Amino acid sequence: MGDTMSAFSDSCMNILGYAGVPDANKEKIYSKIKEFAAMEDQSAPDDAARRLRKELGSYFYELYKLVFFKTLEDRHIPEEIFMFLYFGYIDEELAGEENTQILHDLAVSIGHDEEMRVFTFYQWLRLIYSCKKDPSIDDFSTDYITTLRKRKRDGEITDQQEREALEDGEARVKFEIDNMFRSASKMLSSRVTTFVPFFSGQTLTKPLDKSLLSYATVNKMLSIVKGIDFSLFYRQTVYTAPELGLDKTFIQVEVLPDIILMPLVGTRGAMWQEITGAKRTTPGRFLLPIAEEEDLSGVLIKMCAEFRWELCKRIQGARWNDLSERSLTSDYVDYIDTYRKNRDLSTEAKERIKAAMVKHRKSYKEMFIADYMTYIMYESSGALRHNKVVRAILFNYCPFSKIIREGAIATNPQYVQLIERFVHKTAHEQHLFDIATGRIEKAGNAIPPELMAHYEYLRM
């Protein structure tokens, strides 16, 4: 450990120097970092502590920009810089010796996700800079393109400036840092009211090596959830192939979310957006702290629940709660609105719904999230927790995978009829699919991969 630590004897000055911070500002930031590191209680409620935390927060995001843009020109990025970019590390005293060692070891070995679905925030910004990914929405659910369009409409920029800004890597990255990064960091943090974005060992509630996430861990946990709710990330889209006699065929395509590991310690996750832009077959965005101190499965399931809800609202538009157009959200809203008169609910079930409404402040979305989490975590293994009405809604729109339908709940009286109805519906869809593909094969053509993928979906 000693050899590694000796290389980090003055990380703060090294990082500030790398960023090109002017000497006067460098000394000021350095002194504030050291003052913060020396505090016995960095979450102290007094005015001086609050001012210091606020000041450090204002330094962090501007420093992150400077460091990021400098790395674009550097083929030999120092290890301390990666530690800053991946984890928010700034100072060995603030982090603590053991934590500094752990962060160093991960920073030099982190690599890339082979499935290209999970990214560090630094990797994510590079994709945005190179226009391979678009900046995320801001706090008002407005994306970068819409923001530029509004600025042009308001006369702030010209048509030419708008076109240039769309491909301006620096402007794109600044939009991401100034909007999503600033807001999401505090949202994900384990200390919302006393949040400081620089990494501090004092904020940890468990050993750091037990909370740091890897690409493999996140991908594995997401696969477990998908193994229960198989249709979670599938979207219905239209497939056309006139040369095969297919003018308008509805198929299901899986669109997995982009998952970004944010450089902070936290206890939450955020389903930041359900799609990218206006196209419905684009990836959503899930955010996780790179050091997640809560149980990852619960955090991820909660994000998936919110994704289910928000994607349905997006697809349904203004009619998301209109029962004349049946959907997950409209059926669930009706269930909550009419529970008092619902004869399929026992008195005990009605009391539970009433209590849940109080707990979740009458938020349909929050109530659904809680019910979905129970459905995935308990009902999928045969441990019944739900009443028959909400169970039917969830199974109708979020059916369990085949291995669960034929396993844990196969003979459960509460699920037998639901499963039979699902099997009948799927068999009908498979029959129609067989007719369509039969015509294609009869004409001597190969079945397109998109249709084969849809066939696999029908067998899940």
Enumerate the language-model features and the residues they cover.
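Non-Sec secretion/translocation targeting segments of pathogen effectors
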Residues: 1-6, 460
